[in-house]
């Protein structure tokens, strides 16, 4: 039987990694024994904390050419966020909770997208709909992804369905979501040991917006000043990234996970348009965005509107 490659987006976060593992389990329960989870980048500290805590193995790094291979995408659909050879692959299934853009297939496919806070919540629903048992380890991976994407249920993207799923999964996983979740988020929030390049690329996605290619990186922290203290070296890393890639604008979002606010650092072409998108002015290339924590719901839409 031909292998099925399952993976999330580049610069993977907890939802991208965990949902690939969960989807592979779902496929196997549906009789697809050739399904295997992969990742498109390094496992970040937050995700590694979750994997270690629940004794789960990280997926293998995908290095193969996907031409004519069967693939399933989770937690993304836009080609520029996916594997380099994705346009030559046979995309059989997508499970996602983001906008649909820069995506097409040559053949029909299963596509499930819902405006929920996390891909793992959709997968939870799929397990329930099929009557599949959700084992404790799978439950723990689902719960970790929901906590991550919702910033412990504080993000405006978090829905009642996400909260209900998390409550059910908390019981199966046998952990206290608040206590475990805060420790997991803290594990991924320290930037002291990270290089500037690691910080700007750890959770970065590329978006096509009008005539612009925009790179938006997000870093969670418990102290935004820890990030701003390194502004000069971060700007150098961003400038080098802009000069060496086809990006027009780079937006680094430093999100305070305790106070649910963000500070943006913006460099590139027409950067003032980014400030206008949020009705603020850049001061030394930065601006404070109170109450903004979600890239998907609070950052991408206004920037898209401003640049389109």
Swiss-Prot record:
Enzyme class at the top of the EC tree: hydrolase
UniProt cofactor note: Binds 2 manganese ions per subunit.
Residue positions binding Mn(2+) 2: 15, 75, 97, 149
A Pfam cross-reference name: DHHA2
Enzyme Commission number(s): 3.6.1.1
UniProt name for this protein: Probable manganese-dependent inorganic pyrophosphatase
Primary localization class, coarse: cytoplasm
Binding sites annotated in the UniProt record for Mn(2+) 1: 9, 13, 75
The keyword Nucleus is annotated on this UniProt entry: no
Similarity section: Belongs to the PPase class C family.
Compartments (UniProt record): Cytoplasm
Entry keywords, A to Z: Cytoplasm, Hydrolase, Manganese, Metal-binding
PANTHER family, per the entry: BIFUNCTIONAL OLIGORIBONUCLEASE AND PAP PHOSPHATASE NRNA
GO CC entries: cytoplasm
Reported cofactor(s): Mn(2+)
Source taxonomy: Bacteria, Bacillati, Bacillota, Bacilli, Bacillales
Organism per entry: Staphylococcus carnosus (strain TM300)
GO terms for MF: inorganic diphosphate phosphatase activity; manganese ion binding
Catalytic activity line of the entry: diphosphate + H2O = 2 phosphate + H(+)
């Amino acid at each position: 039987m031909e292998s099925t490659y399952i993976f999330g987006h580049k610069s993977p976060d907890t939802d991208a990694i965990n949902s690939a593992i969960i989807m592979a389990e779902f496929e196997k329960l549906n009789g697809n024994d050739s399904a295997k989870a992969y990742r498109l980048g390094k496992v970040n500290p937050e995700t590694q904390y979750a994997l270690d805590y629940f004794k789960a193995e990280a997926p293998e790094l995908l290095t193969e050419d996907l031409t004519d291979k069967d693939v399933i995408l989770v937690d993304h659909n836009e080609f520029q966020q996916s594997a380099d050879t994705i346009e030559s692959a046979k995309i059989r299934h997508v499970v996602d909770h983001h906008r649909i853009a820069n995506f097409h297939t040559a053949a029909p496919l299963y596509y499930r997208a819902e405006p929920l806070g996390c891909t793992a919540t959709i997968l939870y629903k799929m397990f329930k709909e099929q009557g599949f048992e959700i084992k404790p380890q799978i439950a723990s991976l689902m719960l970790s992804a929901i906590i991550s994407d919702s910033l412990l249920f504080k993000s405006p993207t978090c829905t009642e369905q996400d909260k209900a799923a998390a409550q059910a999964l908390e019981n199966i996983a046998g952990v206290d979501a608040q206590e475990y979740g805060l420790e997991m988020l803290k594990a991924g929030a320290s930037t002291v040991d990270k290089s500037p390049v690691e910080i700007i690329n750890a959770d970065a996605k590329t978006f096509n917006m009008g005539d612009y290619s925009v790179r938006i990186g997000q870093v969670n922290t418990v102290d935004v000043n820890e990030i701003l203290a390194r502004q000069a070296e971060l700007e150098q890393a961003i400038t080098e990234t802009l000069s060496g890639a086809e990006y027009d604008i780079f937006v680094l979002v430093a999100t305070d996970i305790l106070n649910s606010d963000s500070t943006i650092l913006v460099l590139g072409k027409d950067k003032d348009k980014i400030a206008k998108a949020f009705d603020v002015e850049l001061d030394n290339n930065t601006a404070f965005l109170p109450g903004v924590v979600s890239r998907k719901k609070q950052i991408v839409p206004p920037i898209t509107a401003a640049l389109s």
